Design a protein with these regions (language model features):
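Helix-to-beta-strand junctions that scaffold the AdoMet/dcAdoMet cofactor pocket
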Residues: 38, 116-117, 130-131
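Conserved beta-strand signature within the Rossmann-like core of class I S-adenosyl-L-methionine
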Residues: 134-140
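C-terminal alpha-helical "lid/dimerization" subdomain adjacent to the S-adenosyl-L-methionine
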Residues: 22, 141-185, 191-193
Length: 210
């Protein structure tokens, strides 16, 4: 966790200042989450970054514990929560392995799983923290099926950036790899949503087996 935390601490200012790339798709994700969540839900978000999603969903649930490995990211989240007057989001430093035990009605992991070296281990920890029948929603970068510019960058450009400390670990997952890993962890997939256009991210909505 230490190496990853250092990278994201360095990236926090730039990350916080960067606009959301596809605002319409992001708003659609938030709308979907509001349909799935209930006012009495307790929620765990892993890899919350600067807390944008947790704060956007706070009014739809009872309580959110928003976690990240980066203290710098979390500090920005706390500042945003204070500015917004949001009191039901608790920001804590942790990864999946040492996240609060719960169990939670819902666990969220947006733009995270492809950045975890031991994804199977992380998913097992997520399952432990999800109530039986509870919700697990992830949005994950999956490799494009065709050799487009994104595919070539990941194959050729990303390793160079990683070598000089400008990019984190990145798993080259196919959609079938992702779905199989989530199922193996004890979840039943109820819906998948592929992002529109050239956005290679896949949303998986799953429930933990009773």
């Amino acid at each position: 966790m230490y190496k990853s935390a250092k990278f994201w601490d360095r990236a926090a200012d730039k990350y916080a200042a960067s606009p959301i790339r596809n605002q319409d798709a992001y708003e659609a994700t938030l709308d979907k989450m509001r349909q799935l969540l209930s006012p009495d839900d307790t929620v765990l978000e892993l890899g919350c970054g600067t807390g944008t999603t947790a704060l956007a969903l706070a009014a739809s649930v009872q309580h959110i514990i928003a976690t990240d490995v980066s203290d710098a990211m979390l500090d920005k989240g706390r500042e945003k929560a204070q500015a917004a007057g949001t009191t039901n989001v608790d920001f804590r430093q942790s990864d999946a392995a040492d996240a609060p035990a719960g169990p939670f009605d819902a666990v969220l992991a947006f733009n995270l799983l492809h950045l975890i070296e031991d994804m199977d281990g992380a998913l097992a920890e997520i399952a432990k923290r999800t109530k039986p029948g509870g919700l697990f929603v992830s949005k994950t970068f999956c490799m494009p099926e065709h050799r487009n510019m994104i595919w070539w960058f990941i194959q050729l450009g990303l390793p160079i950036m990683q070598a000089i400390g400008k990019a984190p670990y990145f798993a080259k997952l196919s959609t079938s790899d992702l779905d199989a890993a989530i199922t193996k962890a004890g979840f039943t997939i109820v819906e998948t949503i592929n992002a529109p256009g050239k956005d290679p991210r896949r949303t998986v909505i799953a429930r933990r087996a009773d």
